[in-house]
Amino acid sequence: MGFSTFLKLQALLARLAWGASRTCPDPSVIEHQKCSPSGTRTVIYQHHHRKLATCVAVHGVTINGGQDPRLIHFARTMAHFGVTCVVPTLGGLASCRWETSDLDELANIVTFTADTIQQPVGLVGFSFGGSYALIVAGRSEALKHIPWVITFGAYHNLADVLEGYALNLKREPQNKTEWDEAIYQRLVCLYGQRDAITFPQEGWQELEALLRRYCSEASFEEKRRFYNHYLHDLDTEVFKPLPEPEVLNKLSPEIGRASCRERV
């Protein structure tokens, strides 16, 4: 790594660490919305003249989808340094559900983007989105377009993750951090099963509002109030997501990439 590249990397990391609230709007970054050929909402962030590379940034389990404030800040920062960021909202993850259709759509977006710009497209994935990125990078239709993959917090096996969720439901949280995680897991599982669960209408509205702000704006006191009012007396069985084994396998990088003959 040359010295100038090292300095650019330092500047990029510093800008990411500042957060959106401490970063001034950048007039050189252009944002425009598009729909993929199959109709998935996508926002593209790019520098008005500096275009060094292109990547697709994949969100995790968040009902904000590609509009998660942290992901927007990441995309704007990357664009500031010349990396065009394509940010889709994947329907399954944005609904707190585990759906293999997200993999198909992500692969389609990568292929469509690469064909459009006639250049390779990298993948950057966060949390569950990181695991999806790894799986898609091993697919034959997308593999040739993806020169690199970067993930943050990806899992290896979805069944193990959900088993951990189930075990956590049986434990009494011992500190603020554990409470924060326990409440979040319950909200995600409940929201993902909203079509099949009887729950007060005002509770659904409060739950959605809380989930949208959970990781960046909602206070711990607000989270505990919601838990005490709506979640405390619910049977823990309600919170257990139950994807079919076939779905678990397809959404697990450990298994989903097992047949890939190329190095990822």
Model-identified regions with their sequence ranges:
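Gly/Ala-rich beta-loop-alpha elbow adjacent to hydrolase catalytic centers
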Residues: G125-A133, V149
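N-terminal cap/lid segment of alpha/beta-hydrolase-fold proteins
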Residues: F3-A53
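Active-site-proximal cap/loop segments of hydrolase catalytic domains
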Residues: A159-Y165, E237, P241-E244, L248, ...
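Catalytic nucleophile-loop/oxyanion-hole region of alpha/beta-hydrolase
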Residues: Q67-F74, P88-G122, A137-S140
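Structural motif
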Residues: A53-T54, G122, W148
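Residue-level detector of conserved catalytic or cofactor/ligand-binding positions
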Residues: G256-V264
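Alpha/beta-hydrolase-fold enzymes
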Residues: I135-T236
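Short, surface-exposed "cap/lid" segments of acyl-processing enzymes
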Residues: H48-F81, V87-L90
